[in-house]
């Protein structure tokens, strides 16, 4: 009996505890990143932003949570009730499930699997089903159009993200996210005789793919200027028009969890994860999770600034950018990276 407990029950309890801690921390981080997003947008527009609930409006997100929870969920009379309520739950759960393999520090992951990046790519690809189900089950024109746009948009830009992953795989030789971070201890900077620093991270040697991944992440998460799924001037709120109360909150939460995931992936794949910007003694003393969060916040700041400054693309421009610009660039970079590694004997 003790052997069964040690072999099966205890590991399961540890994983469950890790998952609960991750979920709580993730929701708090997402709440304050959303607060930061609103503050940045307000600053650009010369407004104050959230400033009523708590000091400097710091508790605004918690007030919004209470507001959503205590509102009555309204289901349209012609909607498919079961699918209508299931869609936001699927979307939010899949968005949060992808975080299970993200290492915020060395050894700090719920599941450190060897195909971590492939797992994220597979699970995040399923999120589109939540949007499609919500748009179809609403039995309304605007949500259905938003769902169709979402399907086309996500499929189009997942191709480019897939080629970015292939390029990183060729460079590192592993799909394990921890291995990808540790491989960035050496790179272009150390080849030039410099100490380990940000010059060794993948953003420099794979800069075109860094740009492709960043812009594709904007499209994949329906962020401006690619928010065609819920374009206010055309579709009001897209697939979320008929949603209110907790179901709407789940869609909204899932969207920002997905945005935070893309920022974390940029940090892991291109910005050295938890590694300090320069490997010197006083920076190495700073816990790795602090560096990881600073880099994640920097990526989120870029997302927020794009939202504030770049006008929305037309739908045909969005598709053209994905298929006629990013796809050829991604293919070329995969071939160029493989050729370079083979010619110089680094493969």
Swiss-Prot record:
Annotated GO biological process: aerobic respiration
Catalytic activity: a quinone + NADH + 5 H(+)(in) = a quinol + NAD(+) + 4 H(+)(out)
GO cellular component: plasma membrane
EC number, as in UniProt: 7.1.1.-
One Pfam family linked to the record: NADHdh
Name of the molecule in the record: NADH-quinone oxidoreductase subunit H
Keyword Membrane set for record: yes
Family: Belongs to the complex I subunit 1 family.
Main localization (coarse): membrane
Subunit structure: NDH-1 is composed of 14 different subunits. Subunits NuoA, H, J, K, L, M, N constitute the membrane sector of the complex.
Protein source organism: Brucella melitensis biotype 1 (strain ATCC 23456 / CCUG 17765 / NCTC 10094 / 16M)
Keyword Transmembrane set for record: yes
Compartments (UniProt record): Cell inner membrane
MF term (GO), any: oxidoreductase activity, acting on NAD(P)H, quinone or similar compound as acceptor
Keyword terms: Cell inner membrane, Cell membrane, Membrane, NAD, Quinone, Translocase, Transmembrane, Transmembrane helix, Ubiquinone
Enzyme class: translocase
Function, as annotated: NDH-1 shuttles electrons from NADH, via FMN and iron-sulfur (Fe-S) centers, to quinones in the respiratory chain. The immediate electron acceptor for the enzyme in this species is believed to be ubiquinone. Couples the redox reaction to proton translocation (for every two electrons transferred, four hydrogen ions are translocated across the cytoplasmic membrane), and thus conserves the redox energy in a proton gradient. This subunit may bind ubiquinone.
Membrane-crossing residue ranges in chain numbering: 13-33, 82-102, 115-135, 161-181, 198-218, 248-268, 286-306, 325-345
Lipid bilayer topology: Multi-pass membrane protein
